Swiss-Prot record:
Localization (cell): Secreted
Protein name per Swiss-Prot or TrEMBL: Norrin
InterPro entries given in the database record: Cys_knot_C, Cystine-knot_cytokine, DAN, Norrie_dis
Known function: Activates the canonical Wnt signaling pathway through FZD4 and LRP5 coreceptor. Plays a central role in retinal vascularization by acting as a ligand for FZD4 that signals via stabilizing beta-catenin (CTNNB1) and activating LEF/TCF-mediated transcriptional programs. Acts in concert with TSPAN12 to activate FZD4 independently of the Wnt-dependent activation of FZD4, suggesting the existence of a Wnt-independent signaling that also promote accumulation the beta-catenin (CTNNB1). May be involved in a pathway that regulates neural cell differentiation and proliferation.
Assembly and oligomerization: Homodimer; disulfide-linked. Component of a complex, at least composed of TSPAN12, FZD4, LRP5/6 and norrin (NDP). Binds FZD4 with high affinity. Interacts with LRP6 (via Beta-propellers 1 and 2).
Residue ranges of domain CTCK in the record: 39-132
Cystine pairs: 39-96, 55-110, 65-126, 69-128
GO molecular function terms listed in the Swiss-Prot or TrEMBL record: cytokine activity; frizzled binding; protein homodimerization activity
GO biological process: action potential; angiogenesis; blood vessel remodeling; canonical Wnt signaling pathway; cellular response to hypoxia; cone retinal bipolar cell differentiation; dendritic spine development; endothelial cell differentiation
Annotated GO CC locations: cell surface; collagen-containing extracellular matrix; extracellular space
Keywords: Disulfide bond, Secreted, Signal, Wnt signaling pathway
Signal peptide range: 1-24
C-alpha cells in the first residue's frame, strides 16, 4: 500500500513538472531563459528631430520592451442574477512592459542659433505584468 502512495505522489509531481506548475524558481527561470521570444529589452537606433522647427536631427540609441509572456490570456463569462450585464466577461492577460527606466535628454541645434531639448524615457529592464483594459 505504501508503494502505491509513493508511486502516485511521484506521478503527480512528474505531471506538475511537465505542466510547468511548480514553485521552483530555478525551474521557471530556466524555462524563461531558454525562450528566445520572452519579454525582454531590445535596442534600436532612431533619428530624433523636431516636427515643426528646422533643427539638425540626432541619432539616438533607444530601447523597447518586446516579447511573449509565459502566462496565458483568458476570458471567462461572468454569471449574474441581474438582467443587466455591465461586464459580461472576466479577462486576464499579461503584457511585456517597462519595469525600470530613466529620464534622458538631448539638445538639438536649430536655425537661428536656437537649441531645443527633447526628453524621453530610456528603458533599463522589462517584465510581464497584467494588462490594463
Amino acid at each position: 500500500m505504501r508503494n502505491h502512495v509513493l508511486a502516485a505522489s511521484f506521478s503527480m509531481l512528474s505531471l506538475l513538472a511537465l505542466m510547468g506548475d511548480t514553485d521552483s524558481k530555478t525551474e521557471s527561470s530556466f524555462m524563461m531563459d531558454s525562450d528566445p521570444q520572452r519579454c525582454m529589452r531590445h535596442h534600436y537606433v532612431d533619428s530624433i528631430s523636431h516636427p515643426l522647427y528646422k533643427c539638425s536631427s540626432k541619432m539616438v540609441l533607444l530601447a523597447r520592451c518586446e516579447g511573449h509572456c509565459s502566462q496565458a490570456s483568458r476570458s471567462e463569462p461572468l454569471v449574474s442574477f441581474s438582467t443587466v450585464l455591465k461586464q459580461p466577461f472576466r479577462s486576464s492577460c499579461h503584457c511585456c512592459r517597462p519595469q525600470t527606466s530613466k529620464l534622458k535628454a538631448l539638445r538639438l541645434r536649430c536655425s537661428g542659433g536656437m537649441r531645443l531639448t527633447a526628453t524621453y524615457r530610456y528603458i533599463l529592464s522589462c517584465h510581464c505584468e497584467e494588462c490594463s483594459s
